[in-house]
Amino acid sequence: MITEKIDNISVTTKANVYFDGKCVSHGITFTDGTKKSVGVILPATLTFNTGAPEIMECVAGACEYRLAGSDSWVKSAAGEKFSVPGNAKFDIRVAEGFEAYHYICHFG
């Protein structure tokens, strides 16, 4: 099931802009203190570093990702999630000519 709406949150109004604008996100905080980010990745191949473990939930579009130590790219489309360990790197790519990858990043 795709998350379409998130209620009862506080939103950081200034965007986090990475990789010359290829990735843009906003931080959100729930009333219980849980933090997530909601964002979009435009066509590109990018490498991210994690602090805490992350679950990337695709809400629209698609991407391919590759976890550190792997040679294989794995597709993730709307309604799918993938997990990334804490203190790790992962690559993500969105193909040119395709819809941007819209996501929710669940931390911890």
From Swiss-Prot:
Recorded catalytic activity of this chain's protein: a purine D-ribonucleoside + phosphate = a purine nucleobase + alpha-D-ribose 1-phosphate; adenosine + phosphate = alpha-D-ribose 1-phosphate + adenine; cytidine + phosphate = cytosine + alpha-D-ribose 1-phosphate; guanosine + phosphate = alpha-D-ribose 1-phosphate + guanine
Keyword tags: Glycosyltransferase, Transferase
InterPro entries: Ppnp, RmlC-like_jellyroll, RmlC_Cupin_sf
GO cellular component, one term: cytosol
Single GO term (MF): uridine phosphorylase activity
The protein's Enzyme Commission number: 2.4.2.1, 2.4.2.2
Superkingdom in the source lineage: Bacteria
Presence of the UniProt keyword Cytoplasm in the record: no
UniProt-listed CDD domains: cupin_PpnP-like
Keyword match Zinc: no
Family: Belongs to the nucleoside phosphorylase PpnP family.
Function statement: Catalyzes the phosphorolysis of diverse nucleosides, yielding D-ribose 1-phosphate and the respective free bases. Can use uridine, adenosine, guanosine, cytidine, thymidine, inosine and xanthosine as substrates. Also catalyzes the reverse reactions.
Name of this protein: Pyrimidine/purine nucleoside phosphorylase
Organism: Polaromonas sp. (strain JS666 / ATCC BAA-500)
Underlying gene: ppnP
